[in-house]
């Protein structure tokens, strides 16, 4: 798979090891003929050893054959997250360090999660594009401030903080993009 097609959460082969992509930084240096470079921050699967790799947009990283099992978040067992397969009810347990910053998007009963499995071993999760979270703490809206589009900080029910528009109040349910970590709208 070409470097410009790789997304956060993909599992790839790199330097003889298997890695899950956790973060991607894109840069377009001006003095290099417009070649776009990608810096991948990835963790070995299993093991969780961090590795950085910088690649050109046309460089290839072999995709790893894995099963993607549609699952629901069931519960947290100490530092481990337990997901239940939606078809055969197999429980998949992943440590908090494997989940990483995605833990801020996971709430009880969250559906649409794909657990990635290699040789019957869960190695990673891929979250839905957006999740619904509740705002638990945000400053009140300023009177007459609706004409401006100033964002304000909001603490969510998972402990995560994002920037939201001024009209969002405590107790509201909002959509959060799991790729960018940004406000994506009000939830229905």
Swiss-Prot record:
BP-aspect Gene Ontology terms: peptide biosynthetic process
InterPro entries for this protein: Elong-fact-P_C, NA-bd_OB-fold, Rib_uL2_dom2, Transl_elong_fac_P/YeiP, Transl_elong_KOW-like, Transl_elong_p-like_YeiP, Transl_elong_P/YeiP_cen, Transl_elong_P/YeiP_CS
GO cellular component terms attached to this protein's record: cytoplasm
One MF term in the entry's GO annotations: translation elongation factor activity
Top-level taxon: Bacteria
CDD domains in UniProt: S1_EF-P_repeat_1 (cd04470), S1_EF-P_repeat_2 (cd05794)
Family the entry assigns: Belongs to the elongation factor P family.
Name by which UniProt lists this protein: Elongation factor P-like protein
């Amino acid at each position: 798979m070409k470097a410009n097609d790789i997304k956060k959460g993909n599992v790839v082969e790199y330097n003889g090891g298997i890695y899950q992509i956790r973060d991607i930084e894109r840069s377009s240096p001006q003095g290099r003929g417009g070649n776009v470079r990608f810096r991948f921050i990835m963790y070995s699967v299993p093991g969780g050893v961090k590795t950085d790799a910088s690649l050109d947009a046309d460089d290839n990283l072999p995709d790893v054959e894995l099963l993607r099992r549609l699952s629901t978040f069931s519960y947290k067992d100490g530092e481990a997250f337990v997901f239940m397969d939606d078809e055969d009810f197999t429980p998949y347990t992943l440590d908090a360090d494997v989940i990483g910053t995605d833990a801020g998007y996971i709430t009880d009963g969250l559906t649409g999660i794909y657990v990635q499995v290699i040789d019957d071993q869960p190695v990673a999760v891929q979250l839905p594009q957006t999740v619904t979270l509740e705002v638990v703490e945000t400053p009140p809206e300023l009177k007459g401030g609706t004409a401006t589009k100033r964002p304000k900080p909001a603490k969510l029910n998972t402990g995560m903080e994002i920037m939201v528009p001024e009209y969002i109040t405590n107790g509201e349910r909002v959509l959060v993009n799991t790729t960018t970590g940004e406000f994506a709208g009000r939830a229905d």
